[in-house]
């Protein structure tokens, strides 16, 4: 990553598209002043809401403005000067047609179908360039956008000083060179510094006030401005403190009806607005390009800023105060990052064009566009109009690929109670609260706080185990979410949190790369990552610009990291024992006795602190389902109780209970639609739950398990028993055969022999009940159940020929 704006002399930035007339290492003092150096906020700023799609309400005043009879027209390279909006035009438009409130038109809530009206689509004329308020804007430009809707545009301009005040003398001189601090981004005159500087030094430069703070001294004497002097903040300071927005212009158009100019903005985010917050590797001027778009009026655009890639950013030492770095894109929906694909600037002038999809809502033929007097006088030809509306060479992301317009009747459809219940009971839906696990969550919270609150933070490990579907992972994530809020409030010391799921790793060794990326933000190979992590946790060396903060490492599916020599688990669990590691490890697995199955040197580090999540009983399952359905009247209480008791008797898996209730809601919805009965007055009854249970527990694969031979049932029971013992979904034929031999010997059954067992395993593989490797591997053949172990237990638990199978299920 490119280094920050180090030791640069700031240069005055004119509000044009590209910086011109710049002086090398000199600057006629541009923007930024305040008593304290500008700092980015320490707390996360809420993400932009849907109200951002509505532009600021412009105060046009009450005095009428006389319009000239005829306006002059200029046309240079398809650059058009928009006319000023006046009160007369707005009043005339209101008298002709009732305007829709922007807050209503952009509301994310689907209106009732009876309230919707079919309105004619607004006609638009698109441009590549527009001159607005004596400033030229073009597709692909980066601009500042007002964030406060009720802000006065005149005040905004007055608060944007063209020449920045010095942080020491609080004066602005047009003939004095200034230098910027790489830590606080404050500007200083060279002769105001102590000792004064004769020229701008090379490399990073930090002001004397930041040096005192970094040295650990609490008493820092910061100069105060003279009495009566008004301190004004620059656009850069407002953006980094979340008082302004930055955006990239994707489209430019004018509404033909009212003559208002609009832009399609693609938003930038500062690191504080992402889910991870500001990390140690983030630069002061770093922004993220998001996949969040909005349509706003040109009145909300203030002026240009300049967002550059790392290569250009490293050469922008003298390009002014409005230069920022963007190296990564940020997905606001998934909270993920990826590198920005750098597009060549010359693509727009190339002969090859992008064949973009025609958009129904914006493309119109020449006959449909009714040009006003200004356009008719200009006599724009069809070829020129097409050139102005095309987006030649502009392709910023794949946000519209594969999209299909949703019919109006679907948008206007109001969800019934059953439809709301089906959406709420989905496993992907995050619950508002987590019932029945308050005791476990309190224990996890106390463990983490005790590990990170002490100044002498020593590493600790906690092993969390329990059968699947008992809320282990979601409980830990809920605790971390609550601790994050306490960190923002200042009641808990800051920490670094890294979450890893073992099933998402290509190999156990890749966990080193994931941990290193979570700490440094860079992705390297696992060998180099292991070396750096050993230096970090064993020797106490920093990774990059890392702060001295504890690290909390959450590893889900910990048993996946078990290798032949168990070196991966040993390294991870050995790091917390080092004096300067400040590492807290939370391991989650399904097996209770996993530490006892590992090497003694690993179990001694892992098995000290344990927390067990037992299966849910029927009352807890009933409370979980009722909490999900709070405010939705779709189920009878007896139906919820019936589903809870049925699942609690088999496995106590909350996910299975939610799936049964969701399927019961689908059955009830189908039944009501088939009988033409209003769904508003009907609820899910016990019969619907019974149908869902029959579908789930009497599926074809369960019927096959019930009908297999006696030895096949013993073979499946041995696989389930082996799964419960080891916690590993995958096992070998050798282990299963040993378990079958032990089960047969204990219960007086004759052991069939290895060859017969191998044939039974292959037969179950042909039925797809078991996933297995080719039989030629014999004893080394790997086996795995193709269905949940609960289904096997349900199919074989009540077997009359072999009643003792229930003891192993």
UniProtKB/Swiss-Prot annotation:
Induction: Regulated by E2F. Accumulates rapidly after cell cycle reactivation by sucrose addition following cell cycle arrest mediated by sucrose deprivation. Residues 223-341 form the BAH domain. GO terms for biological process: DNA replication; regulation of DNA-templated transcription. It comes from the Eukaryota. One of its GO terms (cellular component) is nucleus. SMART domains: AAA, BAH, PHD. Residues 1-47 have a biased composition (Low complexity). InterPro entries: AAA+_ATPase, AAA_lid_10, ATPase_AAA_core, BAH_dom, BAH_sf, Cdc6_C, ORC1/CDC6, P-loop_NTPase. Keywords: Activator, ATP-binding, DNA replication, DNA-binding, Magnesium, Metal-binding, Nucleotide-binding, Nucleus, Transcription, Transcription regulation, Zinc, Zinc-finger. Mg(2+) binds at residues 556-557. Pfam families: AAA, AAA_lid_10, BAH, Cdc6_C, PHD. ATP binds at residues 466-474, 557, 590, 655. Residues 1-69 are annotated as: Disordered. Zn(2+) 2 binds at residues 166, 169, 189, 192. It is found in: Nucleus. Residues 431-799 are annotated as: Necessary and sufficient for ORC complex assembly. Disruption phenotype: Lethal. Zn(2+) 1 binds at residues 181, 184, 207, 210. Component of the origin recognition complex (ORC) composed of at least ORC1 (ORC1A or ORC1B), ORC2, ORC3, ORC4, ORC5 and ORC6. ORC is regulated in a cell-cycle and development dependent manner. It is sequentially assembled at the exit from anaphase of mitosis and disassembled as cells enter S phase. Interacts directly with ORC2, ORC3, ORC4 and ORC5. Binds mostly unmodified histone H3, and, with lower efficiency, H3K4me1 H3K4me2 and H3K4me3. Essential protein. Component of the origin recognition complex (ORC) that binds origins of replication. It has a role in both chromosomal replication and mating type transcriptional silencing. Binds to the ARS consensus sequence (ACS) of origins of replication. H3K4me3 effector that positively regulates the transcription of a subset of genes. This is Origin of replication complex subunit 1A.
């Amino acid at each position: 990553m490119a280094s920050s704006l180090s030791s640069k002399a700031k240069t005055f930035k004119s509000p044009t598209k590209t910086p011109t007339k710049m002086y090398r290492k000199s600057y006629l003092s541009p923007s930024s002043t305040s008593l304290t150096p500008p700092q980015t906020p320490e707390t996360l700023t809420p993400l932009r809401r849907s109200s951002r799609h509505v532009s600021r309400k412009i105060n046009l005043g009450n005095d009428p403005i006389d319009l000239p009879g005829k306006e002059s027209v200029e046309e240079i390279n398809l650059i058009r000067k928009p006319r000023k909006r006046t009160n007369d035009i707005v009043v005339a438009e209101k008298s002709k047609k009732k305007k829709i409130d922007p807050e209503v038109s952009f509301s994310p809530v689907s209106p009732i179908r009876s309230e919707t009206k079919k309105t004619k689509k607004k006609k638009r004329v698109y441009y590549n360039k527009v001159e607005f308020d004596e400033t030229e804007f073009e597709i692909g430009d980066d601009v500042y956008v007002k964030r406060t809707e009720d802000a006065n545009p005149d005040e905004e301009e007055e608060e944007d000083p063209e020449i920045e005040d010095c942080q020491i003398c609080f004066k602005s001189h047009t003939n004095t060179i200034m230098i910027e601090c790489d830590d606080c981004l404050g500007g200083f005159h060279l002769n105001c510094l102590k000792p004064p500087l004769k020229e701008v030094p090379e490399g990073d430069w930090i002001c004397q006030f930041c040096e005192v703070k970094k040295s650990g001294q609490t008493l820092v004497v910061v100069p105060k401005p003279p009495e009566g002097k008004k301190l004004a903040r620059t656009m850069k300071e407002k953006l980094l403190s979340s008082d302004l927005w930055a955006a990239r212009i994707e489209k430019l158009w004018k509404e033909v009806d009212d003559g208002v100019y609009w832009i399609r903005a693609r938003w930038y985010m500062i690191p504080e607005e992402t889910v991870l917050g500001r990390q140690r590797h983030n630069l002061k001027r770093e922004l993220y390009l998001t996949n969040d778009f909005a349509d706003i009026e040109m009145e909300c655009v203030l002026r240009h800023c300049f967002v550059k890639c790392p290569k250009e950013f490293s050469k922008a030492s003298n390009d002014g105060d409005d230069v920022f770095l963007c190296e990564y894109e940020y997905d606001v929906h998934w909270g993920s990052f990826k590198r920005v694909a750098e597009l060549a600037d010359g693509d727009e002038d190339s002969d090859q064009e992008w064949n973009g999809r025609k958009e129904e809502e914006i493309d119109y033929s020449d006959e449909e566009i009714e040009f006003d007097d200004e356009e008719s006088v200009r006599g724009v030809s069809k070829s020129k109009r097409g050139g102005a509306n095309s987006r030649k060479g502009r392709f910023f992301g794949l946000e519209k690929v594969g999209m299909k317009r949703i019919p109006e009747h679907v948008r206007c459809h109001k969800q019934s109670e059953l439809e709301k219940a089906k959406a709420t009971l989905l496993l992907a839906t995050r619950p508002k609260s987590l019932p029945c696990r308050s005791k476990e969550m309190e224990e996890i919270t106390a463990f983490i706080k005790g590990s990170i609150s002490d100044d002498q933070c020593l590493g600790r490990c906690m092993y969390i185990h329990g059968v699947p579907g008992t809320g282990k992972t979601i409980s830990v994530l809920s605790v971390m979410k609550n601790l994050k809020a306490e960190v923002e409030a200042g009641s808990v010391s800051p920490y670094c949190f890294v979450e890893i799921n073992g099933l998402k790793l290509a190999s156990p060794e890749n966990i080193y790369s994931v941990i290193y990326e979570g700490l440094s933000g860079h992705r390297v190979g696992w060998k180099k990552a292991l070396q750096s992590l050993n230096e970090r946790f064993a020797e106490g060396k920093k990774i990059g610009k890392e702060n001295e903060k504890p690290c909390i490492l959450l590893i889900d599916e910990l048993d996946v990291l078990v290798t032949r020599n168990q070196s991966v688990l040993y390294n991870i669990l050995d790091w917390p024992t080092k004096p300067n590691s400040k590492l807290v490890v939370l391991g989650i697995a399904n097996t209770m006795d996993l530490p006892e199955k590992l090497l003694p040197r690993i179990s001694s580090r892992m098995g000290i602190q344990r927390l067990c999540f037992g299966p849910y009983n029927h009352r807890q399952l009933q409370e979980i389902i009722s909490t999900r359905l709070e405010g939705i009247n779709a189920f009878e209480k007896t139906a919820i109780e019936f589903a809870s008791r049925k699942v609690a008797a088999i496995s106590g898996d909350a996910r299975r209970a939610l799936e049964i209730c969701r399927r019961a809601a689908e059955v009830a919805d189908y039944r009501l639609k088939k009988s033409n009965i209003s769904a508003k007055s009907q609820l899910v009854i016990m019969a619907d739950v019974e149908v869902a249970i029959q579908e789930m527990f009497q599926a074809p694969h369960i019927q096959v398990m019930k009908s297999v031979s006696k030895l096949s049932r013993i073979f499946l029971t041995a696989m389930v028993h082996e799964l419960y013992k080891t916690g590993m979904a995958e096992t070998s034929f050798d282990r299963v055969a040993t378990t079958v031999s032990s089960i047969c010997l204990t219960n007086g059954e004759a052991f069939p022999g290895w060859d017969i067992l191998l044939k039974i395993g292959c037969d179950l593989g042909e039925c797809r009940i078991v996933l297995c490797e080719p039989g030629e591997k014999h004893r080394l053949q790997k086996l795995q159940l193709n269905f949940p172990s609960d289904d096997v237990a349900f199919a074989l638990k009540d077997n009359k020929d072999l009643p003792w199978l229930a003891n192993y299920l």
